[in-house]
Amino acid sequence: MTLEQGIVLGVIVGIFGLFAWGKWRYDIVAVIGLFSLVVADVIVVKVLRREDSALIDPESALAGFGHPAVITVAAVLVISRALRNSGVVDLITRQLAPFAKNQTLHIASLCVVAAVLSAFMNNVGALALLLPVALKTASEHGRSPSLILMPLAFASILGGMITMIGTPPNIIISTFRDEYLQTLADQPEAAAYLDKIGGVPDSFGMFAFAPVGGLVALLGVVFVTVIGWRLIPKDSLKSAGKDEMFALKEYITEVRVPEECSFIGMTLGEVEKDTGEKMMIFGFIKKDGKVMTPNRNNLVRAGSRYLVKVDPVDLKAIMDQSGLRLEKELRSRIDNIEGEDVNFTEVVVTPNSQLVGRSRAFLRSRTSNSVVLMAVARQGQPIQKRLGDVEFRVGDVLLLQGVQDNIEEHAASLHLLPLAEREVRVGIFSKITIAVAIFVAAILLSMFKIMPTTLSFLGAILAYVFLGILPLRDLYREIDWPVIVLLGAMIPVSGALQSTGLTGEIATAVNNLTESMPAWSIVALLMVVTMCLSDVINNAATALIMAPIGVGIALQMGVSPDPFLMAVAVGASCAFLTPIGHQCNALILGPGGYRFGAYWRMGLPLEILIVIGSVPWILKFFPF
């Protein structure tokens, strides 16, 4: 192994380690990796005097941000917003009501719609649109939302595999394949290999992934609809019913004990028993604001302040009955809200929200104190801090109080998803027709190779803007900028894998270890390894690292790279074991009331089924 190869391997291992650690967001980690390569290249060239360094060219280190894959991912997100604005999605979801009477049909109808929508728009956006619909219909029919939301999230992920634009890994695989094969065509020494695989094959089109991705989506949707939801742990199921449609029973808020409170003189244990265990007191707030764990035998005294875990509906009843009050600062902020339409709204922190990693102070500054944070609910890990010290995470459910118009405005600007019954907004029929026609035209231009996918989608965006379907204020709102930065930074890192020859070294090692194994098993192994990585790090980063390795293995074996690239595409999109593996999984964590360990119960059998079902299908449509 050369010095350059060792450096690239060290950087990639470091990137994977930082991804798994989770201290910094994935886009920051990707930039750290890119910058590390640039610094290493400067040292190798300027200090070690190795002018032939193949690490990375510092002058073109940022070229990844102009890569077609990056532009295509951003364009798909913008088009998703335009389709939502036109009313197309709402028109589809309005047809789901008749199917909600039967539980299996209820789950199946939501999952099918989610999968179809995710094939043509961002899967997180599709899930966000269907989440309120799922919660509303589950409540109306007395079903636990936990039985609905995990199948719905998994179906959104599965649907993205059907088309080239459905998920970032497919876009990455498609563009990487074109660039790699073109590079080979320019190398005389690769002529024998190209002749063996039948020359340079055509580019992957819009539906090139459909034979495999469609089967995976079909298998997955049938599984989660018929079997999967039955595997969700019973202790993860939220109670059902209209009164608790969106209410989580683990909200954290602050209360104080006034002079007239009936709890004075009782022990904390007696207070919890008196409330029917509906309120758990888990923190005592000292005068300096610090929180300590209280003794259950401590007596309640006037003026004491506590952190409690309680359902908001139960808290109101307890306050009315006992005289318990909200903490003074919280109460004063509520009293300062003016307006007749003051109410409570529950919102979920989405992956794109500016609140992620921020505290209540940031929320107050962004909303000009027009919205009050009443409580926070988080699944998996208890919150042992005061509300002002809590750092928000993806999937947290926030209970906000304020004027309804203010809450809706700030929820939209901060990318918070309201968990409230919403009226289905049906766009003007002509706008729906035009929006669909423009999108279909863009796809046809790409399918028939009249125009590259990236440019045809940019043309569609311009049409949406000119026709008023996509207001300028919404133009960049839906773009997932951390993913864009991740892709732009990781593409040069992926290129360094190839330019230093490290992919060849890894491929040789793999072939030596698997020389006695049949070729199909190597495809399956590559898929499984990719799946494992995708469960703990971003799927786009996984595809960028594993695609060159898959191609290197194919080159060593002297076979077509397509089955290996398809295995990477499928594996990178299958992140079903943890809530951190995919943004869709994180989005339902709070509303579904799931624990961290609930995902693998359904996700592991699903991933096994996908490997068993997809490998033969890959080899049928993409033979060696």
Please give the residue ranges for each predicted region:
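Membrane-core helix-loop-helix motifs of multi-pass transport proteins
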Residues: 140-230, 585-617
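Extended, hydrophilic extramembrane loops/domains of integral membrane proteins
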Residues: 391-424
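Membrane-embedded alpha-helical segments and adjacent helix-loop junctions characteristic
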Residues: 45-144, 221-225, 229, 471-557
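Long, charged amphipathic helices and adjacent flexible linkers at domain junctions
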Residues: 235-255, 320-350, 417-443
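Alpha-helical transmembrane segments of multi-pass membrane proteins
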Residues: 104-116, 143-159, 188-209, 519-532, ...
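Transmembrane alpha-helix interface/packing and boundary motifs in multi-pass membrane proteins
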Residues: 15-24, 113-122, 154-165, 444-450, ...
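Cytosolic Rossmann-like ligand/nucleotide-binding regulatory domains
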Residues: 22, 264-312, 358, 364-401
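Hydrophobic mid-bilayer segments of alpha-helices in multi-pass membrane transport proteins
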Residues: 4-16, 23-54, 66-78, 129, ...
